[in-house]
Amino acid sequence: EINILNLNNDNNEIPNYGWPQASYGRHYFDNNDDNDVRYKLSPLKDSHSKYGFVEPLKYFTPSVAISQIIGVDKNFYNTDGNALFVGTMGTAKKLKEGMLSLYFFELKDDKIIKDQFIPIKSRVRDIIYNKENNYLIMYLETNNALAVLKKS
């Protein structure tokens, strides 16, 4: 899940995003056995708002194994709002659509107004934004390589 921490809300409360009571994901110990006592001790609710929690900005089901979320300068994509890149790693056992990739999100008023999926075909372990030269440097774990993403 991606959450925007907003401490400037109307009632001066610290927002609660629900973990570990609410999540669109599954437990780390997930063995697909709903009779597992751990599910009874800490069930996950699919809805956040229904239980008084803040809904996430974005969630991925199944999980894409987010490695890093990094904000970039408005000049990187000529946006009016904020822009984020999200690196993903996936798992060695079950690769699914959206894993081993990079996501771009343009935000305005804490809402996604544009998103882009960029297939990388390698685990994106780390991302650095070079603001001075306006490009991203990524460490790709699967290939043991560095990659540069620059606006064309």
Give short role names for the model-derived ranges.
Residues 1-113:
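Beta-propeller domain segments
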Residues 33-35, 118, 143, 152:
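Generic preference for flexible, low-structure residues
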Residues 100-103, 122-125, 144:
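A generic structural signal for well-ordered alpha-helical surface patches
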Residues 110-131:
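Conserved blade-ending motifs and adjacent loop-strand segments that build the rim/top face
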Residues 128-152:
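Blade-level signature of beta-propeller repeat domains, shared across WD40, Kelch, NHL, RCC1
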